[in-house]
Swiss-Prot record:
GO cellular component, one term: cytosol
Organism: Campylobacter fetus subsp. fetus (strain 82-40)
Pfam families per the UniProt record, alphabetical: SmpB
Domain of life of the organism encoding this protein: Bacteria
Record function comment: Required for rescue of stalled ribosomes mediated by trans-translation. Binds to transfer-messenger RNA (tmRNA), required for stable association of tmRNA with ribosomes. tmRNA and SmpB together mimic tRNA shape, replacing the anticodon stem-loop with SmpB. tmRNA is encoded by the ssrA gene; the 2 termini fold to resemble tRNA(Ala) and it encodes a 'tag peptide', a short internal open reading frame. During trans-translation Ala-aminoacylated tmRNA acts like a tRNA, entering the A-site of stalled ribosomes, displacing the stalled mRNA.
Keyword Heme: no
Gene3D superfamilies, sorted: 2.40.280.10
Designated name of the protein: SsrA-binding protein
Location(s), subcellular: Cytoplasm
Family statement drawn from the similarity comment of this UniProt entry: Belongs to the SmpB family.
Single GO molecular function: RNA binding
Keyword annotations: Cytoplasm, RNA-binding
Length: 151
């Protein structure tokens, strides 16, 4: 049972998700408190491998009003993701050879109340693919509503 703290809905629209992974995330105490209060935004966030380590970039975690004025971390600071070395090497190989991208899908609390990040290997969609996906989604909605009317 996990509780989503933040979701990146735009990632499902902009990318074709190929494979998902779970990673730990290194946060400060005030950032965890802000996440629990729902003050996170993963829109336009992505994951990069820098010097053999995974970092979540461009994720916005705004601080709470109760945070000490002397300790206000940068809201868009890069945050280190924690994974096993073999997994990082596997991701690096796929990103460098296949031209894939790593995006953050969600931040959530696991069963032990530890913040985890759900990241994905994804391939960018072009405009035609996005339009096709929207048409298919609308067709599915219409089909469901038609079934509800007659059942």
């Amino acid at each position: 049972m996990s509780k989503d703290l933040a979701r990146n809905k735009k990632a499902f629209h902009d990318y074709a998700i190929l494979e998902t992974f779970e990673a730990g995330i290194a946060l400060k105490g005030s950032e965890v408190k802000a996440l629990r209060a729902g003050r996170a935004n993963l829109k336009d966030s992505f994951v990069r491998i820098i010097r053999g380590e995974l970092f979540l970039l461009n994720a916005h975690i705004s601080y709470l009003d109760t945070t000490n004025s002397y300790f206000r971390p940068d809201e868009r600071a890069p945050r280190k993701l924690l994974m096993h070395r073999r997994q990082i090497d596997k991701l690096f190989g796929k990103v460098s050879t296949d031209g894939l991208t790593m995006v953050a899908l969600s931040l959530y609390l696991n069963s032990k109340n530890i913040v985890k990040a759900n990241i994905a290997l994804a391939k960018g969609k072009n405009l035609h693919d996005k339009r096709e996906a929207l048409k298919q989604k609308e067709a599915n909605i219409e089909a469901r509503s038609a079934l509800k009317k007659y059942i």
